[in-house]
C-alpha cells in the first residue's frame, strides 16, 4: 500500500516537471515522458489482496481501506486526473513551437514569392524577332552591339535567303537593340511586344460628331487610359463625292487588369452605347513603307518603296502618270504592289494556311468494302418484319423482300464465277483503283484546261498592252498634227498680213 502511494506521488511529480519544462512541445521528449506516464496506471491497477474475512488477521480499525482512502472509488479519481494530464500534454503537442511557426511562415513566404516570380515570368512573353536584310558583316555588328548589351542575351539566326534574325532574351534587351539599330540607321523591321499591345474595343451607338477628348476624359474618370481613338469611314457610295463617317469608334486602351470592365459601360457622353472587343482581322498585313508582306509600317525602318512604280521614294512623291501601267515591287507584274491578286501575296496566303492533311493523297485499302456500305450507307434488311411466329408457321417464304440497293441489284445480276470471296474482293479493289485512276486523269485534264485559260489570259493582257501602246502613239500623232496645224495657221496669218495693203 505504501508502494502504491509512492508511485502515485512520483507520477504527479513527473507530470508537474514535464508541464513546467520549456521543451514540453518537443516530439521526442514528449514520447519518452508519455511512455513513462502511461506506465503508472498499470501499476495502480494491481490492487493489493483483500484481507477481509480472513481468520488470524487483525487489521487496525483506524487504518482506512482501499488504498489509504475511505472512499472505495479513490483510485478511479486518480486515474481520471492522470487522463486529464495526458490530454493537456496532447494539446500541447498539437500546438507547434515558436520556432516551428516561424519556419512555416518563412516557407509560406518563399512559396508566395516563388509563385509571384513564376506568374511574372508567365506575364512577360518572349520578345519577337528583329529581321534584317543585306547585312554584310555580322561579326562587326555583334562587336558593336556588345558595347550596349550582353551577347549572352542575344541569339542570331541566318536563313538561306539572306535574312538575319536577332532574338533577344527579354524586353529590355529588345528595346535597347532596336534603339541602337535606329541610331546606326540599319534597315530592319520588327514587331510589337506582346506586353505593349493595347486592349482594343469598338464603341457602337455614339454619334460620329462626338469629340475625342470627351470620350477620353469620361473613360479616364472610371480608370481606363485611352491611347488612341479612330473613327471609321464608310466606303464611297454611288452618288457621293467622299466617304462619310460611321457612328462608331475604335479605341486603344492601355493594357491593365481592369480592361474587361469597360465592356460593362452602357452610357457614354450622355448616350447609350454598346462596347465590344474589336474583332481580329484575318487578312495578311502589308507594309505601306517597303511594300513587303508580313509586317506593318509602324515597326519598319527600311527604305521607302513606291506602291505604283516600285521606285525608292514614297508614293506621294511618285511622278508616274495615271495612264501608264503600274509595276509591282514584289512580283514585277503590271499592277500596284498592294493588289490582292498578286502572286507573291497568294503564295504567302497559301503558306500561312494551316495544313489539315496532305492534298491530293487518296488512300486505297486492300480490305474489301462490305456490300451496301459504299458511301457510308447502311445495309437495308432484305428480310425485315419477320417475327418468330412467322418462322414457326412457315410463312416466311410468302414475305416479299424489301427493295435492294443499286449495288446489290448489280451484284445479283452478275453470275457467280466460282471464284473465292478473297478473289472477288480483290477484283472490287482493282475496280476502285481504276476509278481512282480515272479521277486522276480527270484532275490532270482540269489542270490542262486551267493552264490554257491562264495562257489565254496572258495573251489578252499582252493584247491590252499593245492597244495601250497604240493609243499612246495615236495621242502623240494627234499632238504632232495639232502642232503642225498651229504652225500652218501662223504661216497663213503671216502671209495674209504681208499681202494686205
UniProtKB/Swiss-Prot annotation:
The keyword Metal-binding applies. It is found in: Virion. Keywords: Metal-binding, Transposable element, Virion, Zinc, Zinc-finger. Residues 20-71, 105-128, 353-385, 400-443 are annotated as: Disordered. GO terms for biological process: DNA transposition. One of its GO terms (molecular function) is zinc ion binding. InterPro entries: Pre_C2HC_dom, Znf_CCHC_sf. Residues 407-422 have a biased composition (Low complexity). A zinc finger (CCHC-type) spans 285-302. Transmembrane segments: none annotated. Residues 434-443 have a biased composition (Polar residues). PANTHER family: DOMAIN-CONTAINING PROTEIN, PUTATIVE-RELATED, ENDONUCLEASE_EXONUCLEASE_PHOSPHATASE DOMAIN-CONTAINING PROTEIN. This is Nucleic-acid-binding protein from transposon X-element. It comes from Drosophila melanogaster (Fruit fly). The gene is ORF1.
Amino acid at each position: 500500500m505504501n508502494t502504491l502511494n509512492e508511485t502515485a506521488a512520483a507520477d504527479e511529480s513527473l507530470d508537474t516537471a514535464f508541464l513546467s519544462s520549456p521543451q514540453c512541445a518537443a516530439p521526442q521528449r514528449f514520447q519518452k515522458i508519455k511512455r513513462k506516464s502511461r506506465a503508472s496506471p498499470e501499476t495502480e491497477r494491481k490492487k493489493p489482496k483483500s484481507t477481509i474475512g480472513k481468520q488470524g488477521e487483525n487489521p487496525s480499525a483506524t487504518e482506512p481501506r482501499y488504498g489509504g482512502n475511505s472512499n472505495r472509488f479513490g483510485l478511479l479519481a486518480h486515474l481520471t486526473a492522470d487522463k486529464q494530464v495526458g490530454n493537456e500534454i496532447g494539446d500541447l503537442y498539437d500546438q507547434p513551437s515558436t520556432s516551428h511557426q516561424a519556419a512555416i511562415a518563412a516557407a509560406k513566404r518563399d512559396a508566395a514569392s516563388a509563385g509571384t516570380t513564376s506568374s511574372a515570368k508567365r506575364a512577360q512573353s518572349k520578345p519577337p524577332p528583329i529581321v534584317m536584310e543585306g547585312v554584310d558583316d555580322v561579326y562587326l555588328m555583334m562587336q558593336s552591339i556588345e558595347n550596349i548589351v550582353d551577347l549572352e542575351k542575344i541569339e542570331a539566326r541566318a536563313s538561306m535567303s539572306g535574312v538575319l534574325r536577332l532574338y533577344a532574351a527579354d524586353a529590355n534587351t529588345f528595346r535597347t537593340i532596336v534603339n541602337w539599330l535606329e541610331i546606326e540607321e540599319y534597315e530592319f523591321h520588327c514587331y510589337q511586344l506582346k506586353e505593349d499591345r493595347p486592349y482594343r474595343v469598338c464603341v457602337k451607338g455614339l454619334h460620329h460628331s462626338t469629340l475625342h477628348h470627351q470620350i477620353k476624359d469620361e473613360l479616364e474618370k472610371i480608370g481606363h487610359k485611352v491611347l488612341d481613338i479612330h473613327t471609321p469611314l464608310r466606303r464611297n457610295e454611288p452618288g457621293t463625292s467622299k466617304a462619310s463617317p460611321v457612328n462608331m469608334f475604335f479605341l486603344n486602351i492601355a493594357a491593365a487588369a481592369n480592361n474587361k470592365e469597360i465592356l460593362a459601360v452602357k452610357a457614354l457622353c450622355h448616350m447609350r452605347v454598346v462596347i465590344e472587343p474589336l474583332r481580329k482581322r484575318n487578312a495578311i498585313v502589308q507594309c505601306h513603307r517597303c511594300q513587303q508582306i508580313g509586317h506593318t509600317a509602324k515597326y519598319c525602318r527600311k527604305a521607302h518603296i513606291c506602291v505604283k512604280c516600285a521606285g525608292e521614294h514614297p508614293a506621294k512623291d511618285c511622278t508616274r502618270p495615271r495612264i501608264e501601267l503600274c509595276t509591282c515591287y514584289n512580283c514585277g507584274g503590271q499592277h500596284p504592289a498592294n493588289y490582292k491578286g498578286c502572286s507573291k501575296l497568294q503564295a504567302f496566303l497559301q503558306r500561312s494556311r494551316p495544313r489539315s492533311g496532305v492534298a491530293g493523297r487518296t488512300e486505297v485499302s486492300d480490305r474489301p468494302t462490305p456490300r451496301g456500305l459504299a458511301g457510308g450507307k447502311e445495309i437495308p434488311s432484305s428480310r425485315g418484319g419477320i417475327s418468330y411466329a412467322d418462322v414457326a408457321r412457315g410463312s416466311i417464304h410468302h414475305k416479299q423482300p424489301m427493295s435492294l440497293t443499286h449495288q446489290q441489284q448489280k451484284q445479283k445480276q452478275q453470275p457467280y464465277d466460282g471464284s473465292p470471296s478473297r478473289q472477288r474482293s480483290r477484283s472490287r479493289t482493282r475496280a476502285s483503283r481504276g476509278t481512282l485512276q480515272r479521277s486522276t486523269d480527270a484532275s490532270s485534264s482540269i489542270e490542262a484546261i486551267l493552264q490554257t485559260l491562264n495562257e489565254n489570259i496572258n495573251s489578252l493582257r499582252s493584247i491590252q498592252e499593245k492597244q495601250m501602246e497604240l493609243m499612246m502613239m495615236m495621242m502623240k500623232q494627234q499632238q504632232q498634227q495639232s502642232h503642225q496645224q498651229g504652225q500652218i495657221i501662223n504661216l497663213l496669218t503671216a502671209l495674209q498680213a504681208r499681202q494686205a495693203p
